[in-house]
Amino acid sequence: MKYSVCLDALYPGVDLAQALPDIREAGIDTVEFWNWSNRDLAALEKAVTENRMEVRCFCTEGGTLSLPQSHDEYLSGLEHSAQIAHRLHCRRLITQTGPETGDHAQTLRNIEEGLKKCDEILEREDLILLVEPLNTRIDHPGYSLVYSEEAAELLERVGNPRIQLLFDLYHQQISEGDLLRHVQNCLPWIGHFHAAGSQNRGYLEDGEIAYSYMFRKIKEMGYEGCIGLEYFPNGERGFNRLPELK
């Protein structure tokens, strides 16, 4: 189990030539980010290569899974995002599922149908798609996929091992709590974690989530993947207090 750093959260507006050596100095060799279309991809590619780092994942762009009329646009965006992933030697893409359509059961069927349409692209491009539930109470009102075990049941119906769950500990603490039980129940589908303090999405130790304990228990469950650090350091940039958790 290792950490990756979300550049958009920890290093907003910081030049990659400054951010990546800082991350390397902290003993972390893996980064992730949100959107690719607003980035200087040549500069990112150069900085990652020079600092011998891995791009773990980033978000696919275009279309909406919860809206059937948008599935063709979604698949086109997935194709384009796949080419960017290959350029960055990245094997994982993050997807959100889009807005609730009014009928939740139908919304889930729409998402399931859209995800099943991704099979051919993911197989051909040798990629993993990470589906992310989000909280609707604070950050994403109207979002379609909220609860971790509902997401796991959805992925079981989709039935493609290349389509996995992104379990965001911050979002799930707000949405449902009881994190370790939900992690244990969802573990066969989890391909990535995100972490942030439950208080204002700040430092990991800000709020009621005991992250040192949480990370230890997740590792004991047998998880060998990555935990993405997606917290916002309260007006500062970079790690600062992260070493206390390592």
Residue ranges and their predicted role:
Residues 32, 56-59, 94, 130, ...:
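Conserved beta-strand positions in the central sheet of alpha/beta enzyme cores
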Residues 50, 67-164, 174:
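Active-site acidic/histidine proton-transfer and metal-coordination neighborhood
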Residues 37-49, 103:
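Active-site-adjacent beta->alpha loops and helix N-cap segments on the catalytic face
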Residues 20-37, 59-63:
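N-terminal substrate-binding region of glycoside hydrolase catalytic domains
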Residues 48, 52-56:
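Glycine-rich, aromatic-flanked loop segments that form ligand/cofactor-binding clefts
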Residues 9-11, 35-37, 61-64, 97-101, ...:
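Active-site-proximal loop/turn and secondary-structure-junction residues that shape catalytic pockets
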Residues 1-27, 49, 83, 89-91, ...:
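Histidine-acidic metal/acid-base catalytic patches
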Residues 8, 36, 66-70, 103, ...:
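Pocket-edge positions in alpha/beta enzyme catalytic cores
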